[in-house]
Amino acid sequence: MSTAESREGAQPGLHAYLRRGGVIAYPTESCYGLGCDPRNAAALRRLIRLKGRDAGKGMLLIADRYRRLQPFVGALSPTGRARMRRSWPGPVTWVVPASRRCPPELTGGRTTVAVRVTAHRPAAALCRSLGTALVSTSANKSGHTPAKTAAQCRRMFGARVRVVDGRIGTRRRPSTLIDLATGKILRA
């Protein structure tokens, strides 16, 4: 186990597991999330299959700081960037231009990507210890209720995902989703 993993509570070998294309279930603000390395197209496709999700929906990224999201974000105006950063860390996800590095599996084939700097300490610590942003989508089969516990994740996905034990936050609803270009609230 690395010093970062032991200090932040990550499971031994988790970073290598994600690099190899593994999918994890981990606690977030309102439920367990499924995640993977956003740079790994095979892992993204695996996650989409696990959920039975429409590949055209895209997925969002979370991180402990904006710097980890930057490789996936395209050009932003200084005003737009400032508006976005004022809302973080917190439960606001912004839809922003995607960089050319952003895999189509992450964007759902769109020119935008959804990003958030999380205020949930365990999720932020996980991103910090792994040194990367993580894909974040609710831990459930598409159309079903998201898992609220590690045990529910294990029952739902078995050995197909590695479960990170922890507590979810106190939010009852998913994050607010806002289009940065238009200011339109896509999900309240």
UniProtKB/Swiss-Prot annotation:
A Gene Ontology biological process term: regulation of translational fidelity
Superkingdom to which the source organism belongs: Bacteria
Domain YrdC-like residue range list: 8-188
Originating organism: Thiobacillus denitrificans (strain ATCC 25259 / T1)
InterPro entries reported for this sequence: DHBP_synth_RibB-like_a/b_dom, Sua5-like_dom, TC-AMP_synthase, TC-AMP_synthase_SUA5
Pfam families referenced in this protein's UniProt entry, alphabetically: Sua5_yciO_yrdC
Name of the protein in question: Threonylcarbamoyl-AMP synthase
GO cellular component: cytoplasm
Enzyme Commission number: 2.7.7.87
Family membership noted in the UniProt record: Belongs to the SUA5 family. TsaC subfamily.
Gene Ontology MF terms: ATP binding; double-stranded RNA binding; L-threonylcarbamoyladenylate synthase; tRNA binding
Subcellular location(s) of the protein: Cytoplasm
Catalytic reactions on record: L-threonine + hydrogencarbonate + ATP = L-threonylcarbamoyladenylate + diphosphate + H2O
Keyword Nucleotide-binding in annotation: yes
Function: Required for the formation of a threonylcarbamoyl group on adenosine at position 37 (t(6)A37) in tRNAs that read codons beginning with adenine. Catalyzes the conversion of L-threonine, HCO(3)(-)/CO(2) and ATP to give threonylcarbamoyl-AMP (TC-AMP) as the acyladenylate intermediate, with the release of diphosphate.
Gene3D superfamilies (alphabetical): DHBP synthase
Keyword annotations of the record: ATP-binding, Cytoplasm, Nucleotide-binding, Nucleotidyltransferase, Transferase, tRNA processing
